[in-house]
Amino acid sequence: MDKLERIELESQVCNELERFIGSGDKLLAEFVIGLADENPKLKDFNKAISENVPDFPESLSSHLFNLIEKMKKKTTTTTNNNNNNNNNNTNTAKTTTTTTTTTTTTNNNNYKESEWEETKLNSNSNNQKKNQFPGLSIPNKVEWDQGKIVDVPIDDEKTKEELKRKQQDMDREFEREQREKRDRDREQQNKRREIDKEPILYKIYDGKVSSINDYGCFVTLEGIAGRRDGLVHISQILSGRTKLNHPSDVVKRNQQVKVKILSVASSKISLSMKDVDQSTGRDLNPQQNIQSIISTNSTNNRSNPFKPNNNNNNSSNNNNNDDDDKYTTSKNRKRIASPDRWGYKQLIASGILSVPEMPNYDKEVGLVNHDEEQPEEDFDIERNEDEPQFLKGTRMNMQQLSPIKIVKKPNGSLQRAASTQTALSKERKEEKNQQRNEMMDSIPKDLSLPWHDPMPEAGERHLAQEIRSIAGQGIDTEIPEWKKVTQGSHIQYGKATSRSIKEQRESLPIFPLREAFLQAVSEHQLLVVIGETGSGKTTQMAQYLAEAGYGTRGKIGCTQPRRVAAMSVSKRVAEEFGCQLGQEVGYAIRFEDCTSPETIIKFMTDGILLRECLLDPNLSAYSVIILDEAHERTISTDVLFGLLKQALQRRPELKVLITSATLEAEKFSKYFMNAQLFIIPGRTFPVDIRYTKDPEADYLDASLITVMQIHLSEPPGDILLFLTGQEEIDAACQILYERMKSLGSNVPDLIILPVYSALPSEMQTKIFEPAPPGSRKVVIATNIAETSLTIDGIYYVIDPGFSKQKCFNPKNGMDSLVVAPISQAAARQRSGRAGRTGPGKCYRLYTESAFKNEMLASSIPEIQRTNLGNTVLTMKAMGINDLLNFDFMDPPPVQTLVSAMEQLYSLGALDEEGLLTRLGRKMAEFPLDPQLSKMLIASVDLGCSDEILTVVAMLSVQNVFYRPKEKQALADQKKAKFFQPEGDHLTLLNVYESWKNSKFSNPWCFENFVQARSLRRAQDVRKQLITIMDRYKLDIISAGRNYTKIQKAICSGFFANASKKDPNEGYKTLVEGQPVYIHPSSTLFNRNPDWVIYHELVMTTKEYMREVCTIDPKWLVELAPKFFKTSDPNKISKRKRKEKIEPLYDKYNDPNAWRPSKRK
């Protein structure tokens, strides 16, 4: 029995070695098991492995040790079962004594009884989740303390020498087996070379003439599997300028000839006899083959000069070319109707028409016979419902879980008001469209005629298009009058001040606390800093630490939740620090690194620091880490919380500062091991908070009425109004301006200033300027003004109680922006804005009951309401597999984690056990979404990585095209030049390649109405991605004009976004059957292909697909077999079951008369 268990253990280890390192050698497996027997501890086993096999991965050795121990435990449990049955009485006595001891220990514990019960409840809930979702609680393979060095006793020197001798013997045996294996492989390859499976381009074959026609002869090729015939055109038989009257003058039937393959298209092969010496078989025109190879190599080397010289992929690439040539050739053929084809036959028979003059004649192939083509069958696919091993039963358990809630009371007054405002917003859009249609109808009919004329005179259609574009876009592009008044003729940049930088720094609330702050940092390893917006904590703390000498031990890192904030803050600190940006003070954001070896203070996004944790979990390059704006609770910030807690335990000298603008002090302090709080007192004054008596149905109208009442009846002081988004703010500004204008000139001036993230930072600076005497300003802003902006002079705040929040739907796997009530903490933060300059008032446009009963205590963190695919992939790459027990401040919902794991599994990043694959490891190295990473890596195998690099870079930027108001028709004409029938991705590729051919010139961009800044940004992103691909030896190959490869690569990453044309209207997604539509700006708008893939969905008046690409449905099953499968032809698919059969209209019978149940 022991021998059988030993054999099973050896086979298990062999399988793991084969899976991870590609060599399942039995001797190596026995050696590893022997080391595990000699070293019962994991640290000793890892050390023994590293000494004997230097390049052996530590994570693999830990995995093998756990596997061996697990197998050993199985054997010990089976042998001990009998002993347990015989010793029940003894075990009972031991249990009694153990229970007594445990009770005594518990009584002597310092923990409170309530804390003990709470811990017990949490452990029970965790155990329940573990049982329901075992795939989310996989043990972490790599422990953090495995890297510590363990001293080896002197007594083990003999053992070490024996192990080395064994290893040397194994190495010699392994090398011998590898030589024998290579010899066998070489012999098999030589045998395979004798007969080719497919014809090879430019190779010379022997053949026999099978038939002779007027335009050439057909030759049956030898040396290829199966029967293959090719055409030698009459022009390819004799070299020189000798003209043949008929091929029978040179060749005879059954004659042996030597031919060279010129091209392979579908099943048609084009051959040449004149390029081959018929006696010796020598290639008389080798230059053609050489030039094609040189051009291919030059293209690849130009794209990536550092790529490895790997010739093993040639055969696979050739096969891909053959398959794609079939698709391209069949697509480009011109089909002739059967009556026309009969007429052509009659003309040829009468001698009026020659064969080369036929429309379906090809110089290389000859006549293309469309009769051979069969009509395409209706290809139906459906979702693959097979669950991986690590997610077995999770879908059933997910149905029992409650959905993600971002609203406390879905039927409350606040939620009803949000729904009403959404309906009113749609009404405003419809009213705008109606105005546009009325303007279109007002155009003279005679000017519209050239637009409908298929063959207009030169210039007529251009004039009509200009008029139509002015009518169609004039409402949208014309600058409203309120904007003209607000912006004025002169714009001042920045907050006007006459004080020096030193005086500005000393005027901040944090300056008097400088010494106390440094003292607190030196005494505590972790510090939670609470300070309101404008206290100076972001710009000053890092400088205080650098001045105190913390920058000599390592960098001072400061994270920001937004890229714009990281760049702007670093510029300000560099100015105060007295250095050039990028030297002592720098910043790092995605695809942009503005630092140097001299950098002391480094500002970065929280995502950048998370990626640095992937490479160095200890963050050894930093002496201090500042997590700024932690109250915003982004996904990366929440993950960094848990990682930094672990890093603090491993590095006692590391200092971590958590800053927040809200007073969630107890929560942060409790999570960070009762960390010390450092509070920066702000300039706060009392605020009078007022509620409405009844709920407001239209909060936008109520807000504007409140603004006018304050302006007409309250003392001087500026107003701050919170709304949800750009569209709502613009509508409010327009309505408010018209209402104030209708009051006449006797009313004091009201300056209307909008603020939202889409506005340039230079345009937002007007809100900081004081209003002129005798006037008042109203700032209408999103929740960006809650904490990120400090506006002086605000005495009145109007809070409708809503904001836009990103919410993830695990059912369809998409994020969406929804209008939802704010939290109580956000409401307090908004009211606090009125007490910065003096005593103020806050008008809450909801009832006090709604504040207490319908608002959550604090905002839901982003990690609990958004997609976690990228986050889970990063954590898996760090070795964190136990996601349920990871130390999150607020754990994400289980259904969101399961959805992320399913997505990564379908992309091939996870295996059947939920562990990271080699593909997943590569995907984690790219700073991209998992779909884009998979698309980029798959393009290497498909032979189109050069083009996909460009597509990914162009997708990362926005607003490539622009349409100036006065030249909209010309801009549309220029844009149409770049259109590709395959879709928007190829259109973006065409734009970049055209810009590249113009030597990246700015005049070309201006001429073609393309944003030069966006293209330069895409160029920088592309260079960064090329650097990562070079680092991991990924080839950069160009597909040329073969767009099928590019479409396949896009499909390999975004297969979940596939949609099929709906017979009634628009499209329906394959995953959920959701109705979607192609965006009007798309290349494929009004073309309506049957199958498409989209990059993202945008919700305006409809669910629009943006960046759309056509696909072949067969690719979905081929490239994503874990996600899609072909429907069973013997059964009705789920999609067809949902379709309703509508009979043809029959005025004499009932519509349901055809049903068997209705028949008599």
UniProtKB/Swiss-Prot annotation:
Catalytic activity: ATP + H2O = ADP + phosphate + H(+)
Ranges of biased composition (kind: Basic and acidic residues): 155-192, 425-438
SMART domains found in the cross-reference section: DEXDc, HA2, HELICc, S1
Name of this chain's protein: ATP-dependent RNA helicase dhx8
Keyword check for Hydrolase: yes
Top-rank EC class of the record's enzyme: hydrolase
EC number(s) per entry: 3.6.4.13
Gene3D superfamilies on file: 1.20.120.1080, Nucleic acid-binding proteins, P-loop containing nucleotide triphosphate hydrolases
Listed Low complexity bias regions: 76-110, 122-132, 294-320
Residue stretches making up the Helicase C-terminal domain: 699-879
S1 motif domain boundaries: 202-274
Compartment(s): Nucleus
A GO CC term assigned to this protein in UniProt: catalytic step 2 spliceosome
